[in-house]
Regions:
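Conserved ATPase "switch" residues in P-loop NTPase domains
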Residues: 117
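Conserved SAM-binding loop
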Residues: 23, 105, 124, 166, ...
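N-terminal helical cap/lid subdomain that shapes the substrate entry/recognition surface
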Residues: 2-111, 120
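Conserved phosphate-coupling serine/threonine residues in phosphotransfer and NTP-handling enzymes
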Residues: 22, 128-130
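Glycine-centered short loops/turns at secondary-structure junctions
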Residues: 120-121, 205
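A structural preference for short, pocket-lining loop segments at secondary-structure junctions
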Residues: 122-124, 128
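Asp-based, Mg2+/Mn2+-dependent phosphohydrolase catalytic module
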Residues: 1-12, 114, 131-239
Length: 239
């Protein structure tokens, strides 16, 4: 963490939010998905902490937002390693709607987004590794998040996984927003929670405030060192 004081929000013309782990308190819910997946495919009940540790180990090796390697590793650990990815993803698709309906916004984030929209003369964007259909779901009244804030209405522009060739940690998702608004990177502030996301935002030349998440503790020191500033929750943000 390089800055001792939080950057002034008035210094920026474009403010960009990540989604999972930054707006959505989703990371533990997605590990519950893995728990149900393992139970459904392999008849094994695994503790969530064990799943998180295993996922971190696999994701740390691949350093990619793709889940292919992780699901193949799950099949090697709990099965015979021969199950087709298509079958695994079919089970994920079956379980996912039940899990995502439980995802809540992170405490204080809805108030932050609404306050930025009302108080500051800047554009607000989202740069996410989620698919467009997921953002549409979380903008709807079918989700706990959508009942508090319609993301599609509050955000001026949303760039999703569908819009980029290279996911985070590649900076493309941020560069698209910067290019669209023709804003110098030094006038862009990003809120991120993950090492992949912070890396992408820093590579794009932006200022980064890290939102620490309990499920990214493995990378916490690196996140703090790479980000310009770090907070443990949205209620710490100074307006």
């Amino acid at each position: 963490m390089r800055a001792k004081n939080q950057p002034l929000l008035t210094n920026f013309d474009l403010i960009i939010f990540d989604f999972d782990g930054t707006i959505a308190d989703s990371l533990r819910s997605y590990r519950e998905l893995d728990q149900q997946l393992i139970k459904g495919l392999y008849r094994v009940w695994e503790e969530i902490d064990e799943i998180i540790e295993f996922r971190d180990k696999i994701k740390n090796k691949s350093r990619s937002d793709s889940d292919d390697e992780y699901y193949l590793a799950l099949d090697r650990k709990y099965g015979d390693g021969k199950r087709p990815l298509s079958e695994i993803y079919a089970k994920v698709s079956e379980i996912f709607p039940l899990i995502r309906s439980k995802v809540k916004p992170k405490p204080g984030v809805v108030q932050v987004i609404k306050k930025l929209k009302e108080k500051y003369n800047c554009k607000i964007g989202m740069a996410t590794s989620s698919e467009r259909r997921e953002i549409n779901f979380f903008s709807s009244d079918d989700s706990l998040i959508g009942r508090e804030i319609n993301l599609n209405e509050y955000f001026d522009r949303i760039v999703t996984l569908d819009d980029v060739k290279m996911p985070k940690p590649d900076p493309e998702v941020y560069q698209q927003l910067i290019s669209f608004y023709a804003v110098p990177p030094e006038k862009v502030l990003v809120f991120e929670d993950s090492l992949l996301g912070v890396t992408a935002a820093r590579t794009a030349g932006t200022t980064v405030i890290a939102i620490e998440d309990a499920h990214n503790t493995r990378d916490l020191d690196q996140i703090r060192n790479l980000a310009d500033f770090s907070i443990t929750g949205w209620k710490e943000l100074v307006f």
